[in-house]
């Protein structure tokens, strides 16, 4: 680990932080414990197998943002608690000054490069995020500015009222990094490096391409010393290999165990929990056969999701009910029936390319079943399967007619409106369906403006109905988390939002 300056001030932070809220973020590790110069808990390194390698050089502005948060590398001003509400993180408190302005009070904390977390550094980090292109998904449809306010405050102003801004700032893509992350004079505004520049309990010290990463404990972390002295992360896209690694003791924790492999693990090592992740069929509405709403309707009516639940997920999933599934506990009672759907046309042998990725091993199986169902309905279907990092850019560019992916609907902001804006509006940064519909944009914009928890939920469900009414997306199943965990390991975080995996209390 790199040697860093540790001031009396930062030592004081460590001593006082031991009683503070534990971090719920994740990380990677390898064998062999060591003592910490700072004292406190100290245990062996953790060995963790993750399904997805970094696709964008660990940029916090894209898909790699959740890798960083799950590894315990990055944090935002806020976090989400178990109920999905905003909770303190780098900001210990906040208040709303008017409809468009919030003031966040920072706690004393230190970046992994040894510099202090200051209002100026935080404001600069948020400003860099607003300039990233494409925009981070947490900022879909939102314009904001940030400026330091005194010795411990940051004032954030939005162009339009944003009642869920504290939840939005919990998004992994809005992680706070030190000025060093952006290069001299901010020369890397769109591609900051989180290596040694974040604030979490674990610091990336070595990246071995897309194969593995080494993390060491951040001994000056504001929340106290993590039990594990580090993490050795392996990126293992093959789900069977991840399950075998748990079974043989080669890793301590393996995420995304395939349903087909769950029965092969000893029951004490199998951990499962509900998640807000939905697997969906996204149809390209801008080019190709699915530009025709009638053919999109034909695809929707061809799908039998119960066959996927039983045949592919072996009961570890629920049939697709909408963009929001049963883990979003309030959604079902507020769901609105889609209206104005096109009448299904006969496909007549229309030729389509269906793409998916194999980092989640169930997805190719899902794609094969969907391929068969679409072919039975009269489509000619070519299936293309790649590793996610080799697929994402083509999918976003609309090079496929249909795409099957798994998306956590509350991952980016914890706000149900957030995913609707990023995934289904004209300016959305993760719009795989390439949908641009005036009615959808209008209903999502109305939801964005809506204040009050219940009222905002109602508005989100109205927007969901408008989106489903276009048949741009066909919800297939709502997934469960299945993880393999050694019986020697304690404190693994099974987070329904999938932002966290390893916390400061995770140990063996």
What are these model-predicted stretches?
Residues 286-327, 365, 467-472:
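Periplasmic-binding protein-like
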Residues 137-182, 206:
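Surface-exposed binding/hinge segments that line
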Residues 49-98, 127, 197:
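N-terminal lobe/hinge region of extracytoplasmic solute-binding protein
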Residues 218-263:
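Ligand-site clamp/hinge motif
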Residues 314-348, 360-362:
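Structural transition elements
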Residues 170-224:
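Gly/Pro-rich hinge or "lid" segments in bacterial periplasmic/extracellular proteins
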Residues 389-390, 421-486:
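Extracytoplasmic/peripheral linker and loop segments enriched in polar/acidic and small residues
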Residues 483-508:
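Long beta-strand-rich cores associated with HINT superfamily self-processing modules
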């Amino acid at each position: 680990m790199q040697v860093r300056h540790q001031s009396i001030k930062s030592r004081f932070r460590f001593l006082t932080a031991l009683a503070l809220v534990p971090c719920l973020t994740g990380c990677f590790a390898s064998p062999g414990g060591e003592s910490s110069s700072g004292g406190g808990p100290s245990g062996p390194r953790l060995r963790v197998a993750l399904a997805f390698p970094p696709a964008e050089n660990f940029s916090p502005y894209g898909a790699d943002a959740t890798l960083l948060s799950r590894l315990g590398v990055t944090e935002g001003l806020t976090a989400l608690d178990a109920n999905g509400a905003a909770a303190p993180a780098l900001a210990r408190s906040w208040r709303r000054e008017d409809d468009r302005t919030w003031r966040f009070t920072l706690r004393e904390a230190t970046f992994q490069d040894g510099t202090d977390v200051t209002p100026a550094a935080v404001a600069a980090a948020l400003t860099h995020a607003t300039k990233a292109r494409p925009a981070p998904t947490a900022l879909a449809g939102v314009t904001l500015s940030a400026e330091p306010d005194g010795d411990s405050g940051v004032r954030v102003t939005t162009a339009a009222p944003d009642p869920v801004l504290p939840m939005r700032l919990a998004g992994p893509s809005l992680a706070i990094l030190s000025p060093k992350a952006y290069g001299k004079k901010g020369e890397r505004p769109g591609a900051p490096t989180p290596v040694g520049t974040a604030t979490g309990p674990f610091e990336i010290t070595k990246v071995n391409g897309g194969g593995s990463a080494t993390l060491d404990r951040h001994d000056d972390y504001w929340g106290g010393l993590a039990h594990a002295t580090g993490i050795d992360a392996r990126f293992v896209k093959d789900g069977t290999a991840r399950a075998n690694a748990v079974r043989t003791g080669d890793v301590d924790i393996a995420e995304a165990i395939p349903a087909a492999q769950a029965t092969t693990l000893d029951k004490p090592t199998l951990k499962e929990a509900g998640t807000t992740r939905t697997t969906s069929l996204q149809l390209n509405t801008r080019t190709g056969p699915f530009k025709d709403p009638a053919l999109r309707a034909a695809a929707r009516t061809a799908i039998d999701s119960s066959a996927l639940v039983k045949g592919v997920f072996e009961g570890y999933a629920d049939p697709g009910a909408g963009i929001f599934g049963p883990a979003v506990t309030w959604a079902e009672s507020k769901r609105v029936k889609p209206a104005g759907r096109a009448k299904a046309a006969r496909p007549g042998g229309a030729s389509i390319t269906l793409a998916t990725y194999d980092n989640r091993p169930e997805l190719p199986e899902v794609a094969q079943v969907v391929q068969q169902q679409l072919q039975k309905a009269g489509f000619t279907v070519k299936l293309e399967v790649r590793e996610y990092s080799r697929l994402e850019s083509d999918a976003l560019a609309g090079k496929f007619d249909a795409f099957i992916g798994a998306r956590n609907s509350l991952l980016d902001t914890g706000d149900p409106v957030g995913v609707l804006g990023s995934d289904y509006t004209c300016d959305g940064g993760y719009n795989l369906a390439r949908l641009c519909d005036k009615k959808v944009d209008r209903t999502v914009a109305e939801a964005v403006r809506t204040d009050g928890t219940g009222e905002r939920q109602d508005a989100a469900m109205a927007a969901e109905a408008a989106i489903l009414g276009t048949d741009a997306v066909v919800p297939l199943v709502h997934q469960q988390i299945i993880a393999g965990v050694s019986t020697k390991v304690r404190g693994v975080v099974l987070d329904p939002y999938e932002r966290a995996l390893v916390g400061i209390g995770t140990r063996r």
